[in-house]
C-alpha cells in the first residue's frame, strides 16, 4: 500500500519536483520548501510565477514577480540566472547544456550555454516557452499560434499559425510534434516536418497540465473528469484517433497529470486533492492519495519512479511512496 508523507504549507504550490532524491515544492508566495532530513525553506522571490528543474536535475530554476530568474541548488544556495527589472517572469523552460529560457510581456529571453543572453521580440504576449529535445531550438506560445527560434543563430523564426490564444507549449520527446494548450478548452498540434495541423478538442475545461509518456508514445492532459491521453505512436500522431480516458470520475475534474519515468502509467490529480495512478495498457487504477485540501496543481515522479511529489492550490503538499 502506498504511504504518504505530508507537508502542510500555506500557499498555492506552483511546482512539485525533485532535485536528486530531495523533493522540492515551489510556492506562489516565493518560498521554496524541501524535505531533506527535515523541512527546510528558502525565500527565493517576492511572489513566484514559474519553477522548473534543470534537465540534469541539479538545480531548480525559478521566475518571479520581482523580475529575477534564479537557480536553487539542493543545499538551498541561490544563484542568479537573469534579471529583467520590474517585470513579471511568467514563463520558464530548462534546456540542454544548461540553457534557460524565460518570458515577460512580448519578449522571450534565452540564456545560452556560453552565458550569452538573447532577446527575442514578438508582436503578441509570450504565454509559454519550451525547448526542443535536441538542438538549441525554442518554441513560444502566443496569440494565434506558435513561433520557433534557433536562438544561438541569426535567422528568421518559423511561424505556426492557428487562431486563438495558446497558453502552454511542449515538444514531443522525438521532436516530431509541437503541442499547445489553448484558452478555448482544446489542444492544438503541428507535425513539424510538414506543418500539418492536429486538433485535439472536446475538453469541458481548460487544459492546465500536460505530460509525455516515457517513450513519447502518449501525451496525458488534464481538463476533463478523466485524464485524456492522446496516442503518438505513429508518424501522424493522434490525427483521426480517439484518446484514452483514464481515471474517470463523475464528481471531480482532473487538474494535474504526471507520467511515470519508465512505465506507461500516469499519476492523475483531481480538483478535490485525490491522486490515482492508471496504466495505459489495461486502464487499471490504484489509489495513491485520498481527497484533501485544494486541487492538485503539480506532481512529479523521482527518477526511479518509486516516489511521487505532489502539491495543491491550498498548499497541501507531500510525497507518495509506492515502493513499500
Name the predicted role of every residue range.
Residues 1-324:
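WD40-repeat beta-propeller superdomains and closely related acidic/aromatic-rich repeat-like regions
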